[in-house]
Amino acid sequence: DSAAPKGRLILPQVQVLREILDNDANAIIAKENKLKEALANLKRPPSLVITDSQVFGEIESIVPETIPFTSFSILFARYKGDLTTYINGVKAIEKLAKNDKILIAEGCTHHRQKDDIGTVKIPKWLKEYTGVDLTFDWASGGKYPANLAEYKLIIHCGACMLKRREVL
């Protein structure tokens, strides 16, 4: 994750590692360019591979289909929110039309990076995928626009800084 401070893991990674350790399981950490080697060095395949969403496609091409595979974002969607609601929201992407309004909401007020996933990457991906111009608004720190009904899609971060009840 390019937003990660040099020499540090981001909070979702730390929380997942803590959960793995608390459950007496093992965690192996590898960068995307070392994953193939790390998997080859194991005596048996891992129970699960977890990746950063920004390299999902790259990692998917490395991980054998027999190994379950997910992202930190999907884990946090299940842990902090209602995955069924999120899946239904993803279906709304197929119905997006020119100039539809999309809200991207983040639980915290972190400093945005030049290649920020919420303000740069997700809007770019959605425009590429739908092939139409879309209108984006952003909210952070739990402050939302008054009229949420005007948005055709609301995308929320993984909520690593929030409690589940705050997300629901």
Predicted regions and their residues:
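C-terminal-of-GTPase-core extension/linker across diverse P-loop GTPases
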Residues: D1-G118, W125-K127, S140-L153, M161-L168
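Short beta-strand/loop segments at the ligand-binding rim of alpha/beta enzyme cores
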Residues: G131-L134
